[in-house]
Amino acid sequence: MVFADRADAGRRLADQLVRFRDVPDVLVVGLPRGGVPVARQVAEALHAPLDVMLVRKLGVPGQRELAMGAIGEGGVRILNDDIVAYHQVSVDEIEQVAAQESAELRRRAAQFRGDRGPVELAGKIVVVVDDGLATGATARAACQAARQRGAAHVVLAVPVAPHDWVQRMGTSADEYVCVGAPRQFFAVGNFYDDFAQTSDAEVVECLRSSAGPPAPATAARRVRVRGVVQGVGFRPFVHALASSLGLVGSVGNDDEGVIIDAEGPPASLDEFARRLRDEAPPLASVTAVEVCPVVSTGARTFTIAASAAGDGPPAGGAAALPPDTAVCADCVREMFDPADRRYRHPFITCTNCGPRFTIAVGVPYDRVNTTMAAFELCPACAAEYHDPDNRRFHAQPVSCHDCGPTLELVTADGAVTARGDEAVRACQQLLDHGAIVAVKGIGGYHLMCDARNDDAVTLLRLRKRRGDKPLAVMVADLGVLDGVAEPNGAERGALLARQRPIVLLRRVDRSGRADSPIWPESVAGRASEVGVMLPYAPVHLLLFDGLGTDVLVCTSGNVADEPIVVDDTDALSRLGTLADAWLRHDRPIHRPCDDSVIRVVTETPGDGVMPVRRSRGWVPLPVDIGTWPGQELPGVLALGGDLKNVVCVTAGRQAWLSQHLGDLGELSSYQAAQAAVQQLLALTRVRPSVVAIDAHPGYLSGRLGRQVAAAMGVPVIAVQHHHAHVVSALAEWRLLDSIDDDHPVIGVAFDGTGYGPDGSIWGGEVLLVGPQRARRVGHLAAVPLPGGDAAIEHPSRAALSHLWAAGCAWDPRLACVAATSEHELATLRTQFERSVATVPTSSMGRLFDAVAALAGVRQAVDYEAQAAIELQAAADGGERGSYRFPGADRDGAIDAAPVIRAVVDDVLAGTPCGVVSTRFHRAVAEMVRVEAARAAAMVATPTVVLSGGVFQNATLATMCTELLLADGFDVRVHRMVPTNDGGLALGQAVVAGALFAAGGEMGKD
């Protein structure tokens, strides 16, 4: 197969594209220079317009032929993050290269087009043409640039390419067309008799002489918009945009998102499609704009049509519900304006704020499908709802004092003592006098009290069985934090974001100062951080207006480890021993949704957000997980673990994680998980092909998964705990298509408990991880752990276990020994000697507990990871010393005994706890560095993933990341889902989906 020249190649290529001849909205673009003469022949044969696609490679400084990305017209920029990180290209260097290539882009654009601008791509079928494909780097960038400029469908067409070119290009284009793809391929020019270089003048002539057919005066198009486009004011936005452009037609919601029929001049329709994405409302997230020509309906105006609901799974995926968001500034301004009819209305909302996920009972998102359906609009609200010029045009939860809902204050006997604004005033008086009030918000009830009233805080801890566990606070404004915490710019941004999460802020050390506030100590105890959030519901702002305090304890309305209470009757019974009064309203909460918790960490890769609990403000937004090599994953339901339970549904590129559900050991949490499974399946319309569970045979989540799978008639796949942890991070970074089981990444999974295939408890693991398999190549040497849960609740037991394994005497001068009775010591000694009632564990979490107990930090805990949290808080930032782990033995076991012996020596020598803590943290980080290097020698990979609950420790995560980056590794930590068990279900779903898609039996339950 040899072409005479580029014109001959273009004509033969056009024969492969005849189905696009005379099709509206087809545009041909050639890649300068050599691709343009080929594209000219294609454009003329298809009767389509011709333009150039200007793309410039961004070369690595000093290695210009190595592409670290590309730029295109319209501000399109594509970066290969892996190349940038591996070659340590700085932001300044990227900008310098981009500036040089941008200048060349402008020069070429002016030379090729003259006074004409680029042809609009939005909504078009774009055929990208080159004279051949070798590496595909430029073609790939051109396709991505076309997508970013709004192309509805991208076709990559070349005369000749290597035989495996479609696999190389992956998902860059929607279609691939080629005249020939020989196995013996050396260079494009080998397939042309005449392959003379194309000049700039020839490109200009091709563009000048290749004019497409005259555009019709009007056209009709159907536009499908996908993403978070319901409940965010998208239909009013579309109505306003279409009207401003003189278009006619309609817009409506359906099961898949928003559907638009629009008619008007083609240029206006092009602009309309582009602006749908570029100017979407603030709460919207547009993932796709799909355009196709249709027959005119003869519409004369542009209207909002009634929503359409279908049966069964939508072909293109279910519409995405938006999460609940904080009240916006416009609504706050109205709420405190005495002249406004919504003055002090506790349920004020608009298209840009308020509850969504928690009040929606189904899709499409319309008032009739929300818990606001029971509240009939008053004439004034109805007029606003139907007025295109009003900011509450089609705002589904709109309400006022006349239409409801209504606040009321209730006492323990169920008596209503005040309503409306009087209920707010009465609640303020109770809080000012030290009472604990259960306040119903957006996602459930909170228990609130004055954080500056130490007696009230102590009483709340006692009633809630909270022990020393830190309590979150809600502050009236950021000024309240003066002298308590000094949030940086990123932390302030997180506090003020529309999600309004609880942000963990490092406390300022003001010990011993007379002006030191007392409340941080009472709410946070010995933790180094305090959890802070700002008011996000209108009722919160009303409570602070006139309240005697500017900081309230704001903790979930539940008993420890149970889900947050949402039902009013349940609130009186389940919170009856906790609260003195209830400030509630009559708007039902369909789905419970606890507050999200995040930490901002700027020293590690990513945008700095480390999710600790992903719930209100983020749920139910899907996580884009990309594709697994060569295909999309099947529908999977994953049940997560028993602690911090979250369930997950995946289909294609998307994963939907539920809100935080609690610990399944509590019956109410187990029931909440059952409900969440059904709600998530109904919301996403996914019909799972397989159910994923944790490999632990005794987990309640596994039992639930088996029950659901049996009811659906689908198989169950059990996934090893730490494999799931690492893969969850790979999924959120969309790295699944860059690895396989023969080319794994290095996964470091540190946590407290995870069931190992050998029946022991794992938790200090170094793994080689692919989508289907994880190979254990390193781990802490196992030590015997006595007593199951008792060892978790008493770090002293972990310390005694590690002392025994290290051959250290149980010296009574050690705090862990002194805290244990002689009888218990004798019992434990017998258990160790006879290997009775102990389980071997390689848990890093238990090693942290052991060191905390040895250092005298904590011998018993009131909440999970308390000892490790306080050990981290005690760390001395000025200490530069370190303990040292030995290298792994031939089986990959890493003995902690030398570290334990060094800790004992330091403690008995009177070394301060902070020094011991820092030396231990540094030892663990150095061990991770050494093990990563050892694992990298087994497989050629630069990627290390850090996952598991231990990496919530920001000190350790930062130390590990810095050491690994210095060694040239590409380090990935969690940024979208929690590193703890709250992210486990995502990893389970991906592993099970990969196994199921491959027909594998591995891990089947």
Set out the residue ranges of the language-model regions:
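Glycine-rich phosphate-binding/hydrolytic loop that grips phosphoryl groups
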Residues: 186, 722-735, 745-750, 755-756, ...
